[in-house]
Amino acid sequence: MIAEVPAVPAPPAPASAADVFGPARPTALAYAGILATRGVQRGLLGPREVPRLWDRHRLNCAVVAELIERRRGTLLDLGSGAGLPGLVLAMVLPDVTVTLLEPMERRCRFLTECVTELGLANVSVLRGRAEDVTLRTDVVTARAVAPLPRLAELALGVVRPGGMVLAIKGRTAAEELRAAGPVLRRIGARDAQVVRAGQGKVVPATTVVRFFAR
């Protein structure tokens, strides 16, 4: 077994973590430790990302919860990878049933270990691709999965009619949405817009492309 020693020490949680995670803060701390050790050792997180675990990866994802009005629905996280944003959202939305969809077996093993060790009873891990999934969910989330047109195609295949898709994007989100707008409308997306989550809590605020299924 590989010794769990981080390449770079995990940074302490910032004061804002208590506000963003609330009672889930201890779980968030434990997950940060897992990411800084096994996440790095297994290649799910680059060593240079460890100092930015909180601002770039954890808080950045957690604040997306404020965009999810239904607090007792279902959520599917596409291409979960190391669990961002799906695992983080499951912590702050304990009454939402979260499915982490990931095609790679080694990543699924990592996610399953995290779910078990963190005691997240509202999370299940599903190995597969969005094209092969038959379930329909209230919310779909994604981060760094695919360009927006392809992501929309995948997400609209698994979200229920009227359901919401939240794609965490970067600085070029507005330009990407403008370019993809005609495609999104053609394949059944509506009310697509760029929104900000976590304003006043994280700097910079998280940029999200949000749209709904017809």
Could you tell me what each predicted segment is?
Residues 1-76, 91-92, 106-123:
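Class I SAM-dependent transferase core
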Residues 96-214:
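S-adenosylmethionine
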